[in-house]
A protein has these predicted regions:
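Generic cytosolic/nucleocytoplasmic N-terminal low-complexity/intrinsically disordered segments
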Residues: 1-2, 114
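Sec-dependent signal peptide recognition
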Residues: 2-8
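Catalytic-core signature of thiol
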Residues: 21-286
Length: 286
């Protein structure tokens, strides 16, 4: 039975909602009560990288592993990011640049990444091969974009418009330089694994998870490819009415399932420093 656990919604700002706007907040501030506490792993720092989609979804899967009776794990975000970046750059070149080539992504990218490339623990592949102890993608993003654009431009100048046979190897060379070479085998907690066998050892089935959203420009109870730049792979999500969307969340939490929530932290109702996401009564201008 498929479990409606993965949730994505761009109409709301965050899980924490309140009736007051930030400008009219009560002097004592917002008060929160723990209603349901579920097992989770420690929060990780994505630092200067647009990889929230990967950190949040792997955190969700780590919680799912705990729920299923598995051990507490710290899975490698950069393993997924590195592999998805390769796929995204290839598609960007194939479409002659008509695709969003940035580090952003969505929850289904993580599920696809594990299915296609397996997964490894953080200690096996931290993905920090460039002199920093936390992710910093200022240079990585610029280099990958410049390389892909150069490949497109050079191909367009050739009489046959062909790409060279070396460009994907060059892309992999850039990714390996920044993230590190990907291990084919590794030893973890006394056992030898491949990335695929380690993924297979986890007590979860990636086919069990479904993405939901709530938009009014597509029919409800149908799938559609959400039209946002980060959905670079054009994966589909199920569209349901907003009240049912919230019921899915409440029901999942009540039955002991955590969720993965995709949202837009650039909205004015979100404060990173205060750790609050607020849906105001009145529309915010701009």
């Amino acid at each position: 039975m498929k479990k409606p656990i993965l949730a994505a919604l761009a109409l709301c700002y965050a899980l924490g909602a309140a009736a007051q706007t930030p400008d009219t907040a009560a002097p004592e501030g917002y008060r929160f009560t723990d209603v349901k506490i579920l097992p989770v792993t420690p929060v990780k720092d994505q630092s200067r990288s647009g990889t929230c989609w990967c950190y949040s979804t792997l955190s969700f899967l780590e919680s799912e592993i705990l729920r299923a009776g598995g051990p507490e794990l710290d899975l490698s975000e950069m393993w997924i990011v590195r592999n998805i970046y390769f796929e995204k750059a290839v598609k960007y070149v194939r479409l002659h640049g008509s695709l969003n080539l940035a580090v952003g992504g969505q929850a289904h990218d993580v599920l696809h990444g594990i299915e296609a490339y397996g997964i490894v623990p953080e200690e096996v592949y931290p993905g920090l091969n460039y002199g920093y102890d936390k992710p910093n993608f200022d240079e990585i993003d610029a280099v990958i974009k410049a390389y892909a654009d150069a490949v497109i431009k050079a191909g367009g100048k050739r009489s046959d418009s062909r790409l060279t046979t070396a460009w994907q190897a060059g892309l992999n060379g850039i990714l390996d330089a920044y993230f590190g070479p990907m291990p084919g085998k590794f030893t973890y907690r006394g056992r030898e694994y491949t990335p695929a066998s380690f993924a297979a050892s986890l007590p979860i089935d990636l086919g069990d998870y479904i993405e939901f959203t709530s938009f009014t420009h597509h029919p409800f109870y149908t799938e559609f490819a959400m039209e946002v730049p980060d959905n670079w792979n054009w994966d589909k999500v199920w569209n349901v009415p907003l009240d049912e969307f919230m019921q899915i969340i409440d029901n999942s939490l009540e039955k002991g399932y955590t969720i993965s929530w995709g949202t837009d932290v650039s909205e004015k109702g979100f404060s990173r420093t205060k750790g609050l996401g607020i849906v105001p009564e009145a529309d915010l201008e701009g």
